[in-house]
Amino acid sequence: MDIVGGQNLRQMWDDLAGVYGDKTALIFESCEGIVRQFSYASLNEEINRTANLFYSLGIRKGDRVALHLDNCPEFIFCWFGLAKIGAIMVPINARLLGEESAWILQNSQVSLLVTSAQFYPMYREIRQDNSTPLNHICLIGEQLPADDGVSHFTQLQSRQSTTLCYTPALSTDDTAEILFTSGTTSRPKGVVITHYNLRFAGYYSAWQIALRDDDVYMTVMPAFHIDCQCTAAMPAFSAGSTFVLLEKYSARAFWDQVRKYQATVTECIPMMIRTLMVQPAAPTDRQHHLREVMFYLNLSEQEKDDFTERFGVRLLTSYGMTETIVGIIGDRPGDKRRWPSIGRVGFSYEAEIRDDQNRPLPAGEIGEICIKGIPGKTIFKEYYMQPEATARALEPEGWLHTGDSGYQDEDGYFYFVDRRCNMIKRGGENVSCVELENIISAHPKIQDIVVVGIKDAIRDEAIKAFIVLNEGETLSEAEFFSFCENNMAKFKVPSFMEIRTDLPRNCSGKIIKKNLK
């Protein structure tokens, strides 16, 4: 089913500006509460100015430009400005340090970077090391340095025409972005995303949440992440909705912001749900316009019930990854939900559970979740410059091996068990970290929990739990292990526990387990 019809991102924005004109497209709120607002017409003009800025700096079709930015309107300008001239965006996780950022610059062969003043000292050192092709930095902000090879984004952009001066031929098969995966267990891989991928994501995700042009989609997810781009921004713009982008997440401010912008749709990760739940209850908890909350794994049933009861919202489960572009398995508005199912496969996709020999498994049996799509259209095109990794993950017929364990029931509902790399092998038994985390998170004193496997000379791996307690609480080892013994099989009970003040996370809230082992 071709729902894109040959429309690239340049044509998309020209059409949106013509159709929606003065309607509000983007609202941005900074951490200081400063609000910037753009109509569809004015946002398209800013995108065109930015495209011309890149052209003035020598960027042409096929060139790669890195963005290292926190959430800001300039990210949107650059993302689509590059797409309009056929150039390729390489977003860099704003939490990465120098060595990791330099590795991405080197592996994507980026010569131009757009970043903000706070990150400039790190990139000045990277340039001085001459370890990457980076030769020019375009800075966003005020009181910027006048160093060689540095230009000021706002000054350059404001001088540009709102009419594109460079319009190379574009195809929906052209690469629009190389998005490096989070790399929680190893070096990240560059996921190649096309114009078609992004256009499809807009239509698909808008369908998934029944988005309309009178909706307001608010997100705090980082703009450099696939969730913000393909589950929030693209569907909001594709539907002619208003997209509200917040600079940073604040549990204290979240519901006030939902009410302020009259948001009807938002997205949450487990960390957000847990921190929202520890905020003091208020009479206004249910006073909002939210009809759907897009939700990403993992959450216990008790946490889900407590959240929906307190705030009067529905959690719309969505399962996917960078390589699938969108949530290819999920719930749908109005459909009956079958918790803890992650939902059913969406249109344009197929899904199977496969065994270790790549054979389909019947309902009820646990195996690897495999997804069939069209590379470069409904799933990613390839890993950038990594043909062997691409071949391991993606079969010629379009079957993607997710590396996740799960099963399906007789009615076609899928159930997530764990990341395959998250399974602990303990004395001949496979133990799911997610299962243990869901059980332990029910302890009333525990705010956050992660379980990892550590080497054990006798049983292959031992189980260790890292715990963050609710404010003011204490928890003895005896109390912890007693709780575990009463709620899980003996072979699943952790051997060790460690209380910490926080847990290391990547940009999407996923815990970086390699930092704990």
Curated annotation (Swiss-Prot):
It catalyses: 4-(trimethylamino)butanoate + ATP + CoA = 4-(trimethylamino)butanoyl-CoA + AMP + diphosphate; crotonobetaine + ATP + CoA = crotonobetainyl-CoA + AMP + diphosphate; (R)-carnitine + ATP + CoA = (R)-carnitinyl-CoA + AMP + diphosphate. Pathway: Amine and polyamine metabolism; carnitine metabolism. Catalyzes the transfer of CoA to carnitine, generating the initial carnitinyl-CoA needed for the CaiB reaction cycle. Also has activity toward crotonobetaine and gamma-butyrobetaine. The keyword ATP-binding does not apply. Its EC number is 6.2.1.48. HAMAP family: CaiC. PROSITE patterns: AMP_BINDING. Keywords: Ligase. NCBIfam families: PRK08008.1 (NF005947). It holds the Pfam family AMP-binding. The gene is caiC. This is Crotonobetaine/carnitine--CoA ligase.
